[in-house]
Each structure stands twice: as C-alpha cells, then as structure tokens.
C-alpha cells in the first residue's frame, strides 16, 4: 500500500481523529493545511481536543493548538514500550474526563506510527471492555486493517503484539537482564557484485548505541552463515534495536541490511529467531534472501557460553576491527537528520578502553550533512591515534588525531518524557514489571546539533543487580594520553578501569569493566578540565554557540538527556583535575521564592530541579581548593575499589591551568595536604604520616566522650576494624562529603570545564569557566557481594551556597547550571520527581506531621555506620540514635560581614564554652550551629537549600562569605586544619561563589598552637586593617541575630540543629559567634553570609584553651536571617546592645591585647522548635494545649485562614479589656486567655502582622528567640518550652489527650503510599512482624507487584483504595483489628518504584481468625507525608485511642 500525497484527515471514531501529512510535502503546504485543520477543529470542537503529536516537536503545532502532547519517535521505528503505555493512558484519561473531549493524532510522515497508536489503544481499551465501546473498537480495527496495517513495520507490529500480550496477561514480563553473545545471519545478503557482503552491526538500547561490531568481509565462496560475535557479551535490558549495515567497498556509503527492534521483557528463553518477514528493511528488500533469518543467542551471564565453538565463523571470514572510518560511527538516534540517518563523527571501534576527545580548529570543515558526502580525507592514517569518544560505549575506538573543532551536524529533535508522564508511566508499568529494579543503563553518544554546536557525551553504564560482581561493565571517558599503568591521576577516576573480564584477541586493550548499582563513577564523575585555544568559554544556552556542555544521569530513564562538558586535553600537569558534584534539597523552594535576578529556577524535562546561577564576568581573581588525588586502582583491580576510595582536599598546582588573559591562577593552600603522596611537589603543608591512625584515634576519642554522657551509645567502628579490607587508608569512614556546586565563570579564561568533587572527603571548588554537570536521580545502591561497609554512604549530600546579590549579569556567558545528584538515601528530597502523588487527591486531611516527624520534604537515611537505634523518619536527616532535626521553624541563617582586611598571620581558631543562658539555649535552637560529626554519620540541614559536606581530615570547618568587595562576589573562607584538631583559616578570593563545609568528627582535645603560616594570606589583598572585633561579648550573639545584608537580599541557608531524642540524650550544637570590627563596611558592601552546618550531638564540655580570634566583623545592624518562605536575608532594626546571652569562659587564656582582638564564644544550644512548632494543629487544639499553662506559653502553627502564614497562640495573664467587658463565663474566659497572633511571611522575612513596632525576622526561630528575650509587641515574653506540650497533656490529663486524639481520628487523615505486600504472620506482631514481613518481601520471587494506594485512617479503621485498581479495589481494616504499626526497625529502604523510601507496615488480625495476623507493608510515596507521620497517627491516634469503634 502506498502512502497518500496530501493531507489525510480521518474520523476513526466520533472522538478519535487521525491527521497525517506526507513526509514530502513542502513547509508552505504543511503550514497551510495545518491552519485549515486547526480552524476546522476549533469550530467543531472548540478547545476540547488534545493533539497527540507523533512526529518531531514543532513550534507551529504548539502555537496553533491549545493542548498538545509531544510523544513522537523516529519514523519507521517502533516506539519504546513505556511511551506506548503513556500514549494509551493519556488518551484514555483525556477521553474519559469529558464526553466532549476528542483526541487528534497528528503525524507527519509515514502512517505506520498512527497504526501503532490506534492498535495499541484498541488493545488497551479491550482490557476493560464494555458494550458501549464495542462500536469504537470495531471502527478502530477497520481503520487499522484498511488504512495503516500494511504501512507498519514488522518491529512496530511486534511491539503492539507484545503490549497486547502484557495487557491481556498472556505474556509474562521477563525482568531478568540478558547478555547477547552472538548475532547469526542465516543467508548471506547479496549487497555487492559477486555476492560479496561486508556487514557490520550496531546494538542500541533505548535508541542509544551500546555496541559496534567489526566489519565482516564475506565472499561468495564462504558458507551462507555469518556469526557476529559480541565480545564481551553485551548486557541488554528494555528496548533494544539491532541494526545491520553493509559497508560499500569503494564508496563512503553504507546500506541498511536489516533492522529489528524488540523488548527484552518479551524474550522467553535465550534465543530469538527472526525471519525475513520479521525484519525491517529486509522484509521488502530482494537482496536479502527469502530463506534468510537472523538469530540472537543470549545467556544469563557474560561468561562465554560452553559448547558454542561451532557457532564461530571459519577462517574465510575476515573481520576488520581497526577502522577509523567515520562511516562506521554514524549511529546516534539522538539527533536525526532529514533522511532519518544519524550523523556521527569518527570514533573508535578497536576496543580501546579509554576514549578521548580532541578540539579541532573551528575554521576546518566538519563532516558534511549526510553519509554520502563524507570525503575520503576524513579517514586519517593510523599512525597517530588519539582516543576519541565512542558512541558505542561497549567499544571505545582509537581514531586518528585530527586537531579540529567539533563538527556541526544536521539538527535533530529529541524529546524525553515529561516528569508527569514518567510519574504516570511508572504507575502504569509497575504492574507490567517494566520498572527498572534499581539498575540503570546509559549509553555513550557523540552527536552534534547544528543549533548548539556542541558535543553530546552520555557515557555508557551497565549495572547488574544482585551478586553480579564480575558481570557488569562500564565504559567511561578519559582524556589524558598516558600509559595504561599511569592511573594515579584524578582522570583515572573517570573510568572504572578493571581487567577482570576476558579480553578479545581482536580488541586490544579493551577490557570488561566492573561496576555496580551504586557505582559513584557511573554517575558521570569523569569529565576533566582542558584547554581552549581561543581562550574563551561560552556556556550552553541552547543557542548557536560553541561551549562546554553538561551531562545528566536520569533515574530509570531510557532516553538521552542533556550533554556533559567536553573533555579536552589538559595542560601540563594532568595529574590534578577537579571533579564537581552538585546537590539540591527540596527546601530550595524556600530560597527560590526570593531569588533575585542572579538566580533562575527551572525544571529539567524529567522533573529534576535546576538552578541557574549567574555571576559577574569581570572578576578575574579565582583561587580554589582542589581535591586531593587518591591512588586509583590499576588495571588488575576491581573498579569497586576506585568507587570506595576517597579524594582528599589538596592543592591544585598553578601549572595545571593555562593562564588566562585575566591572569586567573590558583595559589596553593597552606592547609591542604596531598593524600597518599599523589605528587610530592603538590604538598605545601605537613601531611599526616598515617591518616588512618589519626582518624581512628579521633573516632575513639569521640566515642569515649559521648559514652561519658550516654552509656547506651554504641561506639562508632574505627577505620581499622570496619574497613580492614580497604586498599588504602586515605579516607576516613566518616567521609561522606559532597562536592561543590557553583562558581564564577570568566568568559575570557583559557581553561575548559572541570569538575570539583568532594569525593568521600574532598574540598573542591570548580575552576574558571567550569560548569557542573547535571546529576540525576539514578540509583546507586550496591547489592554486590564484597562491598566495603561504607560505600553506601560514600557520597554525602552536596549543596550550593549562593550569594546572588550580583551585578546585572553581562552576557549569557555567565550562566551555569547546577543539577541534582542521584543518591538513593537522598532521593526523597527531589520535588520534581514524585509527581504522581497528587493524582488521587482526597479531601481528607494529610497526616499531621507530629514532633517526631519533620516539616520538610527531604530525607536522609542511616548510613551503614549509624548505630542501630529505633529510626525516626526525617525528611531532613537522621541524627545518631534516630534523632531528627526540625526544619523550617528552627532553622536560622546568619550573616557575618567580612572586613576589608587580610587575615592576619594567626588564623582564627574555634573554642567551646558551655556557659549560656538556658532560655536562650533552648530558644536559639538550631540557629548558628557547628557541631561534630562522628564517622559514618551523614549530615544534612533539614531546610538547607544547598549545602556542601566535604571531608578531608577530622577538622571542623566554617565557611564565611565576606563583603570586602563588590556585592555579590562572596569571599569563601574555610577553617581547615593543617593537623588534626588545629583549625586554621584559608580563604578563597571573591570570584568564588561557594562556601564548602566539612562535616567532621570533632575531637574536643585542646587545639595545638600551630596556626597557618603567613603565606595563607598571600592571595588575600582586600585591605590592610587587622581582623578584630569591636563589640562587647554580649553583642556577639546579637550581632548574628541582627546582621542585615545591606541593600539587596541574599538567599542564605538555614540550619538544622539536633533535638532531644526518645532516649533522653540531649543533642547539643555549637553556637559559633564570629564578631569583628565593621569599620571598613559600606552599606553597599554588606550582604555576605556565614553558613554553619548543623551536626550530630556532642557532649556538653567546655574547651578552655587558647583564646581564639575571629574572622570577619559583625555589628547588630549588619545581620540577617533566612525566612522559612522567602529564603532571603533582611535588615532587622535591633537595639545596639542585646541582653547578655553568654559570658566568655573565664578559663580561657586571652590573646594579646590588641584593639581588634576578641574571643570567639562557642555555645551549646538545644533545639526546641519541635516543642513549640505544631504545623497541623487547629486553633481549638492550640487553645486546649495552652489554656492551663502559665502566661508566656505559646504554640506556633500553620495558619488555616491565611495560606503561607503562621499562627502564634500564646497564653496571657489577663484577657484584653474588650473581652472582660463582654461578661463572659469563666470557662469562656479561660479560653480567652489564649490570644492569637498572625505571623506573616513577606519578602523581607517573617513578622507579627499589624504591629508597627515589630521588626522582620529571617525565621520563626529568630522571631521566637527575640520575643523570649523581650516581648516587643506581645503582651509578655514567650516562655520556651522544655518538653513537648502534647506529652505534658498526655501525662497531666489523659482524658484531654484522648479527646484530642478522638477529634483527630474523627477528622481522619489520608495520603498516597506505595502498597508493597501483605504477609501472613501467624500470631507474630510488633516490630518483629514488620521486620520479618519486609525480609520475606525483599527476597520473594517473583517480587510482589507494588502499586500506589490511597491510605486513609479514620475512626472506622484503615481503608486502602487501589488508585489504578491493579491489585484490588478497596480494602478496609476495622480499627479493632489493627494491632500494631511501625517503621521497619532495620530502616531498610524501598528503591524499586523510584526514589529511596522508608518502609512501614501495620499488623492486623486476619479476617475470620482470632489469632492469626497479617502484616501489610507500605513505602513512602508523597514527600510531604513521611512514613513516620503515618505511623505516629496510626499508633498514637487510632490504636492509642480508647474509643475504638
């Protein structure tokens, strides 16, 4: 059947319309017809039609039509299986939502794609067939048979048939990975004169190339069977395409022999055979023999199949593996040219392990627009090979050195599923078993876009679940020309270089890579800085500019995403390169509210949040800390050793960067050492002789200190006993560092993009022109055997400190992006990822987040080292022993203005002082805190938008942003010790935009006298006045509380402090005060901040030792806070002197008396916000809680009347006169003693509404803290509670608590959760039942099908509603049958259905039995509804309520 030559509009049914345009019609004709069709649709259907665009995305189409869904895929190809399901679900949802709705299927090109959609939807609706739809199905079948069936490709029909089988249940999804060993062609195609054929094969997974074979030369005298050996075996999973080409002998062209697509889920057994009629292209090609067929041979392992020798070719078949012909490299479907072929630059096929990219002169011509136009001169000789990017990823190929710039190729369109589509698809496919069970596969592509002039590099990864320690493979990219044995540079970190797999005799140095699901390097830590001959870097704005690109990893996605930075040849010393990792917390939305023009907030196509930060381009100075370099494993070691190795914080020699016109260089850092002696010339400070020994001593010292206060504390294992198997001891087990996030870019610097990664303990900054690659939500949770204990917590949460009050950004060259990292313990924090939680919204309130549960959406899990105490869910972080920090209400950000003076020869040191006013200790809660981090503890600020945790040695670190320079050019300062427990100061120049943090186990021993040498100030030339303090001691805390940021608001980062836990161990945090003299400030130069990380609990001990001097200057008028909603810092009109909060420790030995010297006072404070912030209680509940308390008692809650505001309810001594005049009854007067005030959130901060004399505060904690000191506009001072008022009510008045619980239960609560499984427990109950049920579920084969259910708790019991009716419709468990509810005591996470989620369950009586129990398991689904909130509600409100129904 031939396709038509004009517009074809067909009403398939009354509500399904197909509109197709021939591929050859002109643009004018297409646009004219499109406008006509649009007018007809609008006149007939109004805005009630949805356009499903099966072709490339077009602006015209989007502009003309109100609702359009771009779901296109390449013509003549089968769509991905998940896309088919997405289209069907979207179509059904749209048609069912309104009887007036119609669907318009638009396609430009072959109608085969329309046939795919119509036949798929026909099968989709047939599952839930009804009589009234029978006519529609008949109409669709008739259209399919008459119009489009003959136009469909065999692969398209194969996919439709597979989907039909899945929907009907006749086909069971094969979820196990398959390793392809052989592709056998039965029958030699006759593509050249004399029966000669020169086939070569390409394998694609998710339309990305993963393997390219050599060229097989088959003559007419050879047998009619060609066996293409895939060596090493290629792991395939999901949508697979095999494409076979014939390379013409005397011309630079190739012909497609056949193409076939299939889904591995449909493969039953280990063999597939496709006849000629099943092959795309070949089915209608006379050159392919009629008896010909293609056979694929799989196995379950990558090992060579025993007894397969007979399959190999005889000696007459010659295989050419070593070719640099660019013809072989055209393979990426990422950017399609007009004829559907893919253009590709030359790349390796000889199996080289490392791939490299060389820049070429921009004046040289690139590869022309099509396969026919490749000049022979583009195949250089083989004498001088440079490793280039191989899009096949299975094979990196040696190609010749050309020294040319990137070629620009024809434009193409590419679209991934939107975040919402993916979320819906996850739900839809979860029943089919299509969800990716933790493993993700990304392939390397090297394609160019005409409009961006860039190179897309997406390295291949293959991850294997379970114990596939020797089976998985990964190829990444290096750009250094170095011997294979020279793997001591950071570049080696970019590739997991293991040679434990078999080598092919033809593949040279290519080896089988070993990887695992949590392979950190597989997340893309492999790009390196290079040189830019033009000396100019232009970022990628999607415009017509050349520049560095980024790459991102997507979670569970099979579609290519954004590219990564180009890999270029570095200058002289390639041994030290920087790696970068970015991080994003859900609290970023707080800061985004007040982002100034310097920041933009957007979402990536797959729902990943993106920060775009601009910084001045005219700031030439740049000093940055570079990561230390560990010894990377040699070729004979496992790549997991590389994954588990840490990179310390080390200097970057100046000669690694090309001097730019602006003379940007990198001075050395006096406080940094090189770990493992990665270069003696790099070591500028004393290196510890035995870092492992130092770490162990520090850990044990901390253990002893904590045991003094808490005998139940379980000592943290030391490096020796926990990591005895680790190859080198360059990293502490508590290294959970992140990387760094944002830095300034100078457009005229001469260096390429680079990475800076705090990998298990590195402090790193991104150099000039650098740009962080995007990291996605990929899972890296390693199941493989032999895993070292701390590898799962190897990456802490990284973050970004932005100082966005910048000058107007001059050009697009100043934009850089920071993306979210993927890490299973942190994945709950990504707002844009879990979108489907709102699909089934109910009017029932959400579960109140009780004091045990936080009020933000982030989540951090126990790393393997954390003590096994009962876990409490926390979206922010889990402190030792299950303590959880609070979020918004107790967070407080501080700003310390930097004076315009260099740091003196003696750098600032911290000292601790335990004396403080109790009320202020409690009120200040989590404001300014520095505390210690025991090994293995991962810290995260619960409402911190971005923050970096970097670990290099057990020394505390504070980051300051100075203001002795133009606003918006922050000065980062870090306290990093040259030796253990000797905190010293080193600084970054103003062009750096980050403030790195080190989370540390902090030994409380006396710090030695050693200070940073005077050279530490060599690069600080901001002034000459000494740093000192002109403030009295009592102003120190007030200065932090009242520091305004000058003219423009600066988003700064709230902190989280630890609170009291169930075991009664109070968690204390350091409160660091950095006073100083502010004489050098001008109003326009203030506005920088200090961010101090919240840390795990420490014993309350004094450190009476050497006095410390402060860095920076603070005055009460130059301080600020971060608003929970605005995220910006604001000016607070405080009195010059605040009450005396603290006294300096008398035991401290003062420094020499000098006008600017002052002691730094460090205070312990306790988090109390969880006592007074009750987000979800009602006004009546607040009155009930407070009416019997003493005056000054208060509660802060979320306002129900004013969205986004807070309500302050406080008890007063006497009611207002207006109330007394009403002669109310005594009972009513008691209620009137509780007065209510509205706390409004404004761009300036939070304040009491309607009170003119009330200042603005940066957070609720700050507001509460100040009003506990002076009442201001309130009737009296606030009394900071020392315990939870809910607990007091429960103890003092059980009946009151019961009534409150009954009210909550009557109202009910509900949210969406993942339903995992129901396991019969006989008579077992309690935590053991939850633990056993989850253990059974995790090993169950096949794994149980999970689905999203609506979980409602009411006075009648628990009701589950399956949103998609996949497993059941509705289940109800009466309240008297529910026995127990709790989180998993082992704190295991559910990662199958997306981000890592906590698991909880409840035990209920089995229906009809008085003794048998059933445990029902669930996992978190909605980030705003943590599992602990649900468990608390069920346990304390429903089960704990005496009024059972």
UniProtKB/Swiss-Prot annotation:
Region (Disordered): 358-421, 538-568, 618-695, 717-769, 859-981, 1076-1127
Induction statement: Down-regulated by EGF.
Record field: compositional bias (Polar residues): 386-400, 723-733, 914-935
Compositional bias segments (type: Low complexity): 1110-1127
GO biological process: positive regulation of Rac protein signal transduction
Biased composition (Basic and acidic residues): 548-561, 1099-1109
Localization per record: Cell junction, Focal adhesion; Cell projection, Podosome
Tissue specificity comment: Expressed in umbilical vein endothelial cells, epithelial cells, and fibroblasts cells (at protein level). Highly expressed in thyroid, kidney and placenta. Low expression in heart, skeletal muscle, spleen, liver, and lung. Expressed at higher levels in tonsil-derived mesenchymal stem cells (MSCs) than in adipose tissue-derived MSCs or bone marrow-derived MSCs. Expressed in tumor endothelial cells. Expression seems to be down-regulated in thyroid tumor tissues and in anaplastic carcinomas.
Keyword check for Signal: no
EC number from the UniProt entry: 3.1.3.-
InterPro entries, A to Z: C2_domain_sf, PH-like_dom_sf, Prot-tyrosine_phosphatase-like, PTB, PTB/PI_dom, SH2, SH2_dom_sf, Tensin-like_SH2
Keyword NAD: no
Record domain C2 tensin-type: where: 175-301
The family this protein is said to belong to: Belongs to the PTEN phosphatase protein family.
Oligomer status and interactors: Interacts with EGFR; EGF promotes the interaction with EGFR. Interacts with PTK2/FAK1 and BCAR1. Tyrosine phosphorylation is critical for these interactions. Interacts with Rho GTPase-activating protein DLC1 and with the regulatory p85 subunit of the PI3K kinase complex; in resting cells, interacts (via C2 tensin-type domain) with DLC1 but, following growth factor stimulation, TNS3 is phosphorylated which leads to weakened interaction with DLC1 and enhanced interaction (via C2 tensin-type domain) with p85 while DLC1 interaction with PTEN increases.
Name of this chain's protein: Tensin-3
């Amino acid at each position: 059947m031939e396709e038509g030559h004009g517009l074809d509009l067909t009403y398939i049914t009354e509500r399904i319309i197909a509109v197709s345009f021939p591929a050859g019609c002109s643009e004018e004709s297409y646009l004219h017809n499109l406008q006509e069709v649009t007018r007809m649709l609008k006149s007939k259907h109004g805005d009630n039609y949805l356009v499903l665009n099966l072709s490339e995305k077009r602006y015209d189409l989007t502009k003309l039509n109100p609702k359009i869904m771009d779901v296109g895929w390449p013509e003549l190809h089968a769509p991905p299986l998940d896309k088919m399901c997405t289209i069907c679900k979207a179509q059904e949802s749209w048609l069912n939502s309104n009887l007036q709705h119609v669907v318009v299927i638009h396609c430009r090109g072959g109608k085969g794609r329309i046939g795919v959609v119509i036949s798929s939807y026909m099968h989709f609706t047939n599952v839930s067939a009804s009589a009234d739809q029978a006519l529609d199905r008949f109409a669709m079948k008739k259209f399919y048979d008459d119009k489009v069936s003959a136009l469909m490709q065999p692969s398209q029909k194969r996919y439709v048939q597979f989907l039909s089988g899945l929907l009907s249940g006749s086909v069971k999804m094969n979820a196990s990975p398959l390793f392809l060993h052989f592709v056998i062609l039965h029958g030699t195609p006759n593509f050249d004169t004399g029966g000669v054929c020169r086939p070569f094969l390409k394998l694609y997974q998710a339309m990305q190339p993963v393997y390219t074979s050599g060229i097989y030369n088959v003559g007419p005298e050879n047998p009619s069977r060609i066996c293409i050996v895939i060596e090493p075996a290629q792991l395939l999973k999901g949508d697979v395409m095999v494409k076979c080409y014939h390379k013409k002998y005397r011309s630079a062209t190739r012909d497609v022999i056949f193409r076939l697509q299939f889904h591995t889920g449909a493969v039953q057994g280990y063999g597939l055979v496709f006849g000629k009629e099943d092959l795309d292209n070949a089915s209608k090609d006379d050159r392919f023999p009629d008896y010909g067929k293609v056979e694929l041979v799989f196995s379950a392992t990558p090992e060579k199949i025993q007894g397969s020798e007979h399959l190999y070719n005889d000696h007459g078949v010659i295989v050419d593996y070593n070719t640099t012909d660019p013809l072989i490299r055209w393979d990426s479907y990422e950017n399609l040219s007009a004829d559907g072929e893919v253009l590709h630059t030359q790349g390796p096929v000889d199996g080289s392990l490392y791939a490299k990219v060389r820049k070429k002169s921009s004046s040289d011509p690139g590869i022309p627009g099509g396969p026919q136009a490749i000049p022979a001169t583009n195949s250089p000789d083989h004498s001088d090979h440079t490793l280039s990017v191989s899009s096949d990823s299975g094979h990196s190929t040696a190609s010749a050195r050309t020294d040319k710039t990137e070629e620009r190729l024809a434009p193409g369109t590419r679209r991934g599923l939107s975040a919402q589509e993916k979320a819906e698809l996850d739900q839809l496919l979860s029943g089919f078993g299509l969800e990716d069970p933790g493993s993700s596969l990304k392939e390397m592509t090297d394609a160019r876009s005409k409009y961006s002039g860039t190179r897309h590099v997406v390295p291949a990864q293959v991850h294997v679940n379970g114990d596939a320690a020797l089976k998985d493979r990964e190829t990444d990219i290096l750009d250094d020309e170095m011997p294979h044995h020279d793997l001591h540079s950071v570049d080696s970190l970019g590739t997991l270089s293991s040679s434990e797999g078999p080598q092919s005799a033809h593949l040279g140095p290519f080896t089988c890579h070993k990887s695992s699901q949590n392979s950190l390097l597989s997340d893309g830590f492999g790009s390196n800085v290079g040189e830019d001959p033009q000396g100019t870097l232009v970022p990628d704005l999607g415009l017509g500019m050349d520049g560095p690109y980024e790459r991102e990893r997507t979670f569970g996605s099979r579609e290519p995403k954004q590219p990564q930075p180009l890999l270029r040849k570095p200058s002289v010393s390639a041994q030290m390169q920087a790696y970068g990792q970015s991080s994003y917390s859900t609290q970023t939305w707080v800061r985004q509210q007040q982002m100034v023009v310097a920041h933009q907030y957007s979402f990536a196509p797959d729902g990943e949040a993106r920060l775009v930060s601009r910084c001045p381009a005219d700031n030439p100075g740049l000093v940055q800390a570079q990561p230390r370099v560990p010894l990377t494993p040699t070729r004979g070691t496992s790549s997991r050793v590389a994954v588990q190795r840490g990179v310390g914080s080390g200097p970057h020699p100046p000669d690694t960067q090309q001097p730019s016109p602006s003379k940007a260089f990198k001075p050395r850092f006096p406080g940094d050492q090189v770990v493992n002696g990665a270069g003696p010339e790099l070591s500028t400070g004393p290196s510890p002789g035995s870092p492992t020994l130092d770490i162990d001593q520090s850990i044990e010292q901390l253990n002893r200190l904590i045991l003094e206060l808490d005998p139940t504390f379980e000592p943290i294992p030391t490096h020796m006993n926990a990591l005895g198997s680790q190859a080198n001891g360059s990293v502490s087990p508590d290294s959970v560092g992140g990387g760094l996030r944002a830095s300034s870019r100078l457009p005229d610097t001469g260096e390429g993009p680079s990475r800076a990664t705090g990998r298990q303990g590195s402090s790193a900054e991104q150099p000039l022109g650098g740009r962080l690659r995007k990291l996605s939500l990929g899972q890296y949770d390693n199941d493989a055997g032999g895993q070292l204990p701390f590898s799962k917590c190897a990456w802490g949460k990284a973050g970004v400190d932005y100082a966005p009050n910048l000058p107007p950004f001059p050009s697009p060259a100043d934009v850089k992006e920071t993306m979210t990292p993927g890490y299973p313990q942190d994945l709950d924090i990504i707002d844009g990822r879990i979108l489907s939680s709102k699909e089934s919204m109910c009017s029932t309130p959400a579960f109140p987040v009780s004091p045990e549960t936080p009020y933000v959406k982030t989540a951090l899990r126990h790393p393997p080292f954390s003590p096994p105490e009962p876990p409490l869910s926390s979206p922010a972080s889990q402190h030792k022993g299950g303590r959880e920090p609070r979020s918004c209400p107790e967070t407080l950000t501080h700003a310390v203005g930097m004076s315009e003076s260099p740091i003196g020869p003696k750098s600032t040191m911290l000292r601790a002082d335990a004396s403080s006013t109790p009320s202020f200790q409690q009120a200040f809660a989590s404001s300014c805190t520095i505390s210690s981090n025991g090994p293995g503890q991962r810290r995260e600020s619960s409402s911190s938008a971005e923050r970096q945790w970097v670990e290099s040695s057990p020394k505390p670190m504070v980051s300051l942003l100075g203001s002795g320079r133009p606003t918006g050019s922050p000065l980062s300062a870090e306290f990093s010790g040259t030796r253990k427990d000797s905190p010293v100061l080193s600084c970054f120049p103003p062009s750096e935009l980050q403030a790195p943090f080190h989370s540390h186990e902090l030994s409380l021993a006396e710090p030695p006298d050693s200070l940073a040498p005077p050279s530490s100030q060599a690069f600080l030339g901001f002034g000459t006045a000494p740093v000192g303090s002109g403030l009295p001691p009592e102003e120190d805390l007030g200065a932090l509380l009242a520091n305004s940021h000058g003219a423009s608001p600066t988003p700064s980062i709230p902190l989280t402090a630890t609170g009291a836990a169930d075991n009664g161990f109070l968690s204390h945090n350091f409160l660091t005060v950095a006073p100083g003299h502010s004489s050098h400030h001008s109003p326009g130069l203030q506005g920088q901040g200090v961010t101090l990380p919240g840390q795990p609990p420490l014993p309350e001990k004094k450190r009476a030792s050497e006095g410390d001097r402060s860095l920076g200057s603070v005055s009460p008028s130059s301080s600020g806070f971060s608003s929970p909603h605005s995220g910006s810092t604001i000016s607070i009109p405080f009195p010059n002197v605040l009450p005396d909060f603290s006294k300096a420790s008398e035991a401290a030995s003062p420094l020499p008396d000098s006008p600017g010297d002052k002691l730094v006072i460090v205070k312990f404070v306790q988090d109390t916000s969880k006592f007074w912030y009750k987000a979800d209680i009602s006004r009546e509940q607040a009155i009930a809680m407070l009416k019997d308390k003493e005056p000054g008692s208060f509660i802060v809650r979320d306002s129900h009347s004013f969205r986004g505001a807070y309500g302050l309810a406080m008890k007063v001594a006497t009611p207002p006169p207006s109330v007394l005049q009403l002669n109310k009854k005594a009972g009513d007067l008691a209620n009137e003693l509780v007065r209510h005030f509205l706390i409004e959130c404004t761009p300036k901060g939070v304040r009491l509404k309607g009170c003119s004399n009330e200042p603005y505060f940066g957070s609720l904690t700050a507001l509460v803290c100040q009003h506990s000191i002076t009442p201001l506009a309130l009737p009296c001072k606030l009394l900071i509670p020392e315990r939870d008022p809910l607990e007091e009510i429960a103890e003092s008045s059980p009946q009151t608590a019961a009534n409150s619980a009954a009210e909550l239960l009557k109202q009910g609560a509900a949210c969406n959760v993942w339903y995992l499984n129901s396991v019969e427990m006989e008579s077992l109950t309690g935590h053991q039942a939850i633990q056993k049920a989850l253990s059974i579920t995790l090993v169950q084969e096949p794994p149980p099908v999970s689905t999203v259910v609506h979980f409602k708790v009411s006075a009648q019991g628990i009701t589950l509603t399956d949103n998609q009716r996949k497993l059941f419709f509705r289940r109800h468990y009466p309240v008297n049958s529910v026995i127990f509810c709790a989180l998993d005591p082992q704190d295991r996470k559910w990662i199958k259905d997306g981000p890592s989620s906590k698991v909880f369950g409840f035990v209920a009586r089995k229906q009809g039995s008085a003794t048998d129990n059933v445990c029902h398991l669930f996992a978190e689904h909605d980030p705003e509804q943590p599992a602990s909130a649900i468990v608390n509600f069920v346990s304390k409100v429903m089960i704990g309520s005496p009024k059972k129904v």
